[in-house]
Amino acid sequence: MTVIVLSGPIGAGKSSLTGILSKYLGTNPFYESVDDNPVLPLFYENPKKYAFLLQVYFLNTRFRSIKSALTDDNNVLDRSIYEDALFFQMNADIGRATPEEVDTYYELLHNMMSELDRMPKKNPDLLVHIDVSYDTMLKRIQKRGRNYEQLSYDPTLEDYYKRLLRYYKPWYEKYDYSPKMTIDGDKLDFMASEEDRQEVLNQIVAKLKEMGKFEDDWKPNLVK
């Protein structure tokens, strides 16, 4: 039984890889609520006003998901609570949160992480980070077509997206809740190429075998 969490910037392909990987491993996918998120469009319309509310919304849903995943112990999550502070801190750094909101957010996050520490299974088994360049990120954002994410909707998103990518490297380096690995999302287009998809799956399975989570003769479910 394994719990795998994915990470990566907006448009990296986390939800797509979650579906591919969960089917391959025979586990259950957990998807972050985006299309039915009532706060996300408001945030893109007025980031300063809604940054705190959006992050509390995400924090709550990610906390619920990781609790369920750790209890079930057989899941792939397309994003997790461990990544949450990265987004809020970036928004705070560019003036989209008051000092009071920053204090409230981190107190809430601390309380939630403390509750996870009391669970029988405290951490995921593996973090899979999808590393992409700005060009790849933008191409995938354009392809999925959410209007409020497009540079044509708000040209200032260019700075936001580039800044977000800069925040990921130190976050990944500091992450220590579980073993971790990186997928090269520029080189391996696992959404469009069957060959690349299989290579990504092979890399993840090899890591799980190295960790002792899978036997050497483990066989996957068939991927259609």
Curated annotation (Swiss-Prot):
Annotated active site: D78 (proton acceptor)
Residues the record lists as binding substrate: E32, Y44, Q55, R79, D84, E149
Source organism: Lactobacillus johnsonii (strain CNCM I-12250 / La1 / NCC 533)
GO cellular component: cytoplasm
Catalytic activity entry: 2'-deoxyguanosine + ATP = dGMP + ADP + H(+)
PANTHER family associated with the record: DEOXYADENOSINE KINASE (PTHR10513:SF35), DEOXYNUCLEOSIDE KINASE (PTHR10513)
Presence of keyword ATP-binding: yes
InterPro entries: DCK/DGK (IPR002624), Deoxyribonucleoside_kinase (IPR050566), DNK_dom (IPR031314), P-loop_NTPase (IPR027417)
EC number(s) stated in the UniProt entry for this protein: 2.7.1.113
Stated family: Belongs to the DCK/DGK family.
Record's subunit section: Heterodimer of a deoxyadenosine (DAK) and a deoxyguanosine kinase (DGK).
Keyword Transcription part of the UniProt annotation: no
Role summary: DGK/DAK plays an essential role in generating the deoxyribonucleotide precursors, dGTP and dATP, for DNA metabolism.
Keywords: ATP-binding, Kinase, Nucleotide-binding, Transferase
EC main group: transferase
GO function terms (MF aspect): ATP binding; deoxyguanosine kinase activity
Cysteine disulfide links: none
Superkingdom as given in the UniProt entry: Bacteria
Taxonomic lineage: Bacteria, Bacillati, Bacillota, Bacilli, Lactobacillales
Protein name: Deoxyguanosine kinase
Residues the entry annotates as binding ATP: G8, P9, I10, G11, A12, G13, K14, S15, S16
